């Protein structure tokens, strides 16, 4: 979207389940044929062949710069020790590495922490806040002795691009691989992922957020050696979201009941 802000909207592709780019065969999960897709539909359905076709036309140097902007190969300040996510593709890379890399495979490695931060930025209109574990510390007399004040860490994308991604992420839930998260209890948006694992069962991914009107919770799930993200990671995310909102509803209605009793 940054490299081709006008033409990406016209993208169209006929998915037949697999394709060959730079002598590398790329398949959609279980060779599913998605048929005619635009960018939004390809995203919602996790169409690998559409994205590898689109990604193979990107300027590799600009692509690497974008990933640097998104904090790959960097230490992210945090209270706990976390590894760096790894992105190796550059203008000197073998052409065979491009197809795998543009769909998040190959030598690309990403931590759940990093994935969650990127989703936080998207949900926050492109702005990433500095992450921390402890909100504040209170003394024995209940006074605050230390407090972490929210501060901006980085602007990762424009508000316009973030809004577009929010719409696409929402469609993953309403009409895509994250459909099992579509519920009346809350609204959700996110992205599933299925990372290949050298002939073993794939790693299942899901990262997303809830309450799309005013996002309040980001969840990232990685289940190793299992299979599709929609089958193994999404159900876990749903349990987390459900627990969060069910508990909040209990607290809310409990407070209303107590208030009503005190008024009487």
Q: What is each residue range found by the language model?
A:
Residues 1-223, 260-264:
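Beta-lactam-recognizing serine transpeptidase/beta-lactamase-like catalytic domain environment
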Residues 51-53, 228-232:
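Extracytoplasmic/secreted cell-surface and envelope-processing proteins
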């Amino acid at each position: 979207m940054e490299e081709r802000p006008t033409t990406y909207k016209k993208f169209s592709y006929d998915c037949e389940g697999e394709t060959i780019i730079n002598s590398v065969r790329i398949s959609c999960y279980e060779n599913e044929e998605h048929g005619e897709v635009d960018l939004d539909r390809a995203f919602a359905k996790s169409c690998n062949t559409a994205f590898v076709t689109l990604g193979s036309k990107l300027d590799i140097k600009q692509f690497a710069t974008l990933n640097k902007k998104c904090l790959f190969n960097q230490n992210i300040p945090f209270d706990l020790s976390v590894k760096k996510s790894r992105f190796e593709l550059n203008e000197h890379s073998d052409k065979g590495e491009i197809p795998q890399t543009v769909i998040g495979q190959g030598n690309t490695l990403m931590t759940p922490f990093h994935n969650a931060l990127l989703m936080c930025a998207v949900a926050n209109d492109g702005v990433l806040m500095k992450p921390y574990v402890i909100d504040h510390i209170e003394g024995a007399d209940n006074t605050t002795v230390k407090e972490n004040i929210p501060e901006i860490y980085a602007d990762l994308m424009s508000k316009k691009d973030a809004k577009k991604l929010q719409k696409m992420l929402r469609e993953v839930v309403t009409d895509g691989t994250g459909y099992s998260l579509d519920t009346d209890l809350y609204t959700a948006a996110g992205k599933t992922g299925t990372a290949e694992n050298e002939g073993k069962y794939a790693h299942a991914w899901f990262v997303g957020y809830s309450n799309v009107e005013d996002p309040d919770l980001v969840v990232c799930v990685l289940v190793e050696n299992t299979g599709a993200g929609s089958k193994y990671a999404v159900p876990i995310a749903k349990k987390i979201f459900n627990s969060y909102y069910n508990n909040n509803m209990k607290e809310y209605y409990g407070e209303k009941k107590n208030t009503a009793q005190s008024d009487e």
